[in-house]
Amino acid sequence: MKRFINDMEKYYRYAVYSAKAELKAEVAGSYLNWIWWILEPFCMMLIYAFIFGFVFDAREKYFTAFIYVGLTLWTFFNQNMKNSVRMVKKNKSIISKVYLPKFILIESKMMVNGFKMLVSFGIVIILMIFYQIPLSWNVFYAIPILICMWIVNFGLMTILVHFGVYVEDLANVVNIVLRFIFYLTGIMFSIEHRIGAKHPELALFLEKFNPMAFLISSMRKCLLYGERPELLGIVSWIGIGIVLTALGIHTIYKNENSY
């Protein structure tokens, strides 16, 4: 772990530089530039709000904001998982010429997706003002929730980065699994109210053992409903994320010469 910390300090500036370069490259050839980072999830929010609000008659409180919070966090997680599978192969031209810890590639990509997520949170603030959602001190729990999500994402990505080198079809498998998890995470509905009404054991299982379901639900509680999230759950997932990170970093260091 000491080597990991030293390498993170040594190559952190590269991660920041790489993230900035990627963000600039994304908007360079676009007429709307960075506005797409807001426009895309906003349009998806409107689509899901129409389908589940009017067609399926979902009626969660502050429904539009409810969906957008879920989509914002899910997009961060979804993009990170998809990007990590082919990360080493995609950056083969760089890592074959100079030594670069593979987890620095992960950190750089997370910075890119994290910046987009923070931009999207601007819409969340606007929606909170629109709905006149009363603020409480519980909104500050959003910070440990985001830290927890970052650690869990990083840990999962270190593992996917390794196996993505050797398993050619892993990207297809990950896409299918992510689509399945999407519908079990409660992006467009409340797991507690919708699933819990008929299957309380399943709802409890999903909220306890699906990290994104737990984190999205926790974020909604502190931002939209003025409630305190389950602190033990946040601490537990931070611990799990640290364990995943330790396993992933150990695996990367052990096999990096064969990548």
Annotate each PLM feature.
Residues 1-259:
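Hydrophobic transmembrane alpha-helices and immediately adjacent juxtamembrane helices
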